[in-house]
Each structure stands twice: as C-alpha cells, then as structure tokens.
C-alpha cells in the first residue's frame, strides 16, 4: 500500500513517546531507577500497548515510563538519536519529531534548556548517520499552565535554529488555546511553522481557535472536524492539513474503531490529511502498519492511501525546493 516511488513521511511523531523498551531498561539499570519489571519481555506490557481494548489511562501510564528514566542530558541525546535510527528502520525518508522539553526534564529536574540542546544534537547526529531528513517541533505542554509554557518556549527559542515549528499539546478542554496567544505570536515572530493538537478531546471550536488565534497551518488529530461542515470546507479550501494517527486514536478512545475514523471523510472532502504514527513505541506499531493494516481497516482505498502519502509531503514543513530535492532523491533510489 506504500508507493515506493514517493517519499514516505511521518509528520506527527512524538520523540518522547517513542523511547524503546530496551532503552528504558538500560537507563533504569544505569541510574538505579525502580522499574515495574527487570527483563525486556516482562517490561514490555508496562511500556507498550498489548491489549486491543482502548484505555486512555493505561496508555498515558505507559507513555510516562519513557521519560521517568531520562536522568541525564546524555540520556535525552540517546533517545533523540535512536528516534532517527527507528525512522530509518521504518523506511521513512522524512520525519518531524516533536517533543516537550519540560515533560522530558521534569522527573529528574533536568535543565529544560539543556534538554533542548541534547535533543537537537541527537537528531542531528542521527540524521547524519542514517540519512534521514529529520526536523524538530517543540511542544508546549499546556497542562503545565501559561507561565511554565513561557519558560518552555524560552528554552526552545534559545535554540531556534534547531527547531522548525511549535505545537501545543495536552488537556485542550482545561487549557484552551486562548491562554497561549502570546506564546504563539512569539513563535511566528521567530519564523516557525505552527501545528496544534486540537479537535481530539474538544470539539470543532478548538480547531477553529487553533487556526484563527494561534495561526495553525496543520492540526494534530482533528477528528472532531467532521462535526462542522463549514470547518471541513475551510480546511480543504485553505489547505490546512490534518495529521491523522489511526491506531493511536483507537488506543486512546478518541474514536471507537478504525472503521469509524474520519480519515476517509477528510480525504473525500479534499482535506489534506496524512497518515502518521503518534507514539510508535508505546503503541507497538510503525508507519508501515498504519499504511498496510490500519488504513485499509479504516476503509481507505488504494488511491486514498496514496493520496494520504502525497499529503504527508505536501504538508511537510519544508520549502518547495526541499520537497523537490526529496522527491528527486527517492526517485534515484
């Protein structure tokens, strides 16, 4: 189902949600951190979804184990490097890795600025070693509140040349986008692209807010957009992309099943929706699974899957020259 003549992209992939079980085990041992299990096989059910039953609470608990072992900046660099290696193993030509430096820093009180620097270094090294074009998106974790997000933003802005875009993630019901207008004004002034998690827990109004008030060029998940025909028209007309994450949306109970996922409706409406993973290590899936298993289960035709692959490149935070170069590189094999 993957068109090998086209670049394969993943533009919604959390770096801090893709920490290998083996790495969690290694770092736990290195820093004497108590883990729920002492072998890889027994640890895996604690850090990776193994049940088909959607369970958001369980999902988030598994997600947290990855950052609980980040006890040094070198550990942060390592997981960033391994993220690019994983992307290469998945056959990705281009990947946008997003991360919340405060979330990564919080368990062991690491300097947030240092985390940003370590992640940038790890991704650069990985891109060089594995020949994957990898870009970084900084996340403001809105659940921490406005002041903490300003500190997080300051750490990202201190290394602005290594960051491509800004994202807002977390509790969109309790911390709506309106609280972060100033943060995103600063991001746009820095020349960054904007993507926002919206329409996942909250309704279409959250997506409208992300677009109109925060300047979102893309929306993460955005499943509730189908509830508002005017919004669907707007997304298509203004080429605002939807970063769809099929398996993740089922595992977190955002949608009831793959068959009920709105990705097919997005594509039929002309919305530039793409296929992405989200938190692959926690989910126990990769981009190949999303194309070959999840997308057909969501009702997508072969041509719609190809369109989603094209949309991933169209919506990538790259210049037109960079996109053309990527297409040429893939064509040459």
From Swiss-Prot:
Leader sequence residues: none
One Pfam family, short name: A_deaminase
Cofactor note: Binds 1 zinc ion per subunit.
Chain positions of site Important for catalytic activity: 221
GO CC annotations on file: cytosol
Binding site for substrate: 14, 16, 170, 279
Similarity field: Belongs to the metallo-dependent hydrolases superfamily. Adenosine and AMP deaminases family. Adenosine deaminase subfamily.
UniProt protein name: Adenosine deaminase
Lineage of origin: Bacteria, Pseudomonadati, Pseudomonadota, Gammaproteobacteria, Enterobacterales
């Amino acid at each position: 189902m993957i068109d090998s003549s086209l670049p394969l992209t993943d533009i919604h992939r959390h770096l801090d949600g893709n920490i290998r079980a083996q790495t969690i085990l290694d770092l736990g041992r290195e820093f004497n951190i108590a883990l729920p299990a002492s072998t890889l096989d027994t640890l895996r059910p604690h850090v990776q979804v193994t049940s088909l039953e959607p369970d958001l609470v369980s999902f988030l608990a598994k997600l947290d184990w990855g950052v609980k072992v980040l006890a040094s900046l070198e550990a942060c660099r390592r997981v960033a490097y391994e993220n690019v290696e994983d992307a290469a193993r998945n056959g990705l030509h281009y990947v946008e890795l997003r991360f919340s430096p405060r979330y990564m820093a919080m368990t062991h009180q690491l300097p947030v600025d240092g985390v940003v620097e370590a992640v940038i270094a790890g991704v650069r090294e990985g891109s060089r070693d594995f020949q994957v074009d990898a870009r970084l998106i900084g996340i403001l974790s809105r659940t921490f509140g406005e002041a903490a997000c300003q500190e997080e933003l300051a750490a990202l802005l201190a290394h602005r040349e290594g960051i491509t875009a800004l994202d807002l993630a977390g509790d969109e019901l309790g911390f709506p986008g309106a609280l972060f207008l100033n943060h995103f004004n600063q991001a746009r002034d820095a020349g960054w692209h904007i993507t926002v998690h919206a329409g996942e827990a909250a309704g279409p109004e959250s997506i409208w807010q992300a677009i109109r008030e925060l300047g979102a060029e893309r929306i993460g998940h955005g499943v509730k957009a189908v509830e508002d025909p005017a919004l669907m028209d707007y997304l298509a007309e203004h080429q605002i992309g939807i970063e769809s994450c099929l398996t993740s949306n089922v595992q977190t109970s955002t949608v009831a099943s793959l068959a009920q996922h709105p990705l097919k409706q997005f594509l039929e409406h002309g919305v530039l929706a793409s296929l992405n993973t989200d938190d692959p290590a926690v989910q126990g899936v990769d981009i190949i699974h999303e194309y070959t298993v999840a997308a057909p289960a969501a009702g997508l035709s072969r041509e719609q899957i190809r369109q989603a692959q094209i949309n991933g490149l169209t919506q990538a935070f790259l210049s037109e020259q960079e996109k053309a170069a990527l297409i040429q590189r893939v064509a040459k094999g």
